[in-house]
């Protein structure tokens, strides 16, 4: 029998309903996986007690015939979602010790539907990054990194005669550590979520996507990442980065699992003024395999200079897969695409600088004392925020300042409107758009740390959908010559995640089963 932590969500639900195993057994298998992969630095907070309590409740519901849509499925939660009574850090020193007195709407929806929380996973600090290297708790290591487990004796060496005598009778205390040939990034900012799902530590994970933070890491580790339409999932209780861009979504191993999880995550929330009051369909029913006549837009502007030939070939292969299934490729133009990244890196830091003004050391989190209130603010923010967060606060404050507001922020918002118009016109010609997810495969930890512009370019294909508020999905499509995963991205009409899911399932079927990463539980 397949290891329980290697089952998909759909397979696990079938097994639970058939009584082949219990939710407690499924959860215990995943808790062992959490322990076995600690060397990847995936989790900030593990919640084994909560998980086992939730699993026991799920077993009782299965026994009573009242099982819920996600009953007993162990998942990981990106540590940007507030969880009542459980440490929530946003991977930042400034939120030290913060345990929210409330639950985010998205996680509340998941617990309502029976999901089991394994813990809170690592991310780039305040979701600002594309590699999961800006976390106060250290970088997440991709399960696609090359390394090996080694056993070492954990006992400290003493000195003196008594220590030598004790050493002679001591039992060895082996601990497992990792030796790495090359540590790769898992992408970001939802790198912990991506690594947890790819390494078979969690069946699925929540992510957030502001400029590609679900889709790009999904591409880097070979899983499915779905950013819904802005407003589809509530933002209430999610630590804010850029409020007009942030959107929660599922990260899973299959398209069907993403459909199952999105149905539980989504829904109107009166506590979020940007939440859309639109029906949530049964996304699993969209997976029909029938895309005959579907018009697939191929934007000519996405053929960027310097894009590796193998990514271009994979893109063309994706077109052929859809064409073979009866879809109709259509070349389209999104003329303002080249302005998307610079506009994003004005709008997002501007909103971040405003959102992060609330962290002052007064009511919660870190406080570094000073001789007066002003110095306490300065000390707390200076010590509490990491380098990348400070950089984006400075950029945001600059572009919002009186002398530069019109030249930068106002102009960026006008460009954003043009980008949205480009997509609106494109929908007259096509039903869905196909592009690469990222311009490269995963790179080594530390390789781009000193070049923020090179790091920002990781989001070149994903940012436009955020600026336009559109749904986007990354589906694994194969391996590059270097043996690392590559993804293809689908972008859809507002609130038409169903068509994305239907189309992605066809790509998934054509690409075939994807290999396990070298490091997995």
Swiss-Prot record:
Annotated EC: 6.3.5.7
Residues forming the catalytic site: 78, 189, 213
GO cellular component: glutamyl-tRNA(Gln) amidotransferase complex
Pfam family, one: Amidase
One MF term in the entry's GO annotations: glutaminyl-tRNA synthase (glutamine-hydrolyzing) activity
InterPro entries assigned: Amidase, Amidase_CS, Amidase_dom, AS_sf, GatA
Catalytically driven reaction(s): L-glutamyl-tRNA(Gln) + L-glutamine + ATP + H2O = L-glutaminyl-tRNA(Gln) + L-glutamate + ADP + phosphate + H(+)
Keywords: ATP-binding, Ligase, Nucleotide-binding, Protein biosynthesis
GO BP, one annotated term: translation
Domain of life (superkingdom): Bacteria
Quaternary structure annotation from Swiss-Prot or TrEMBL: Heterotrimer of A, B and C subunits.
Family assignment from sequence similarity: Belongs to the amidase family. GatA subfamily.
Purpose of the protein: Allows the formation of correctly charged Gln-tRNA(Gln) through the transamidation of misacylated Glu-tRNA(Gln) in organisms which lack glutaminyl-tRNA synthetase. The reaction takes place in the presence of glutamine and ATP through an activated gamma-phospho-Glu-tRNA(Gln).
Name recorded for this polypeptide: Glutamyl-tRNA(Gln) amidotransferase subunit A
Gene designation: gatA
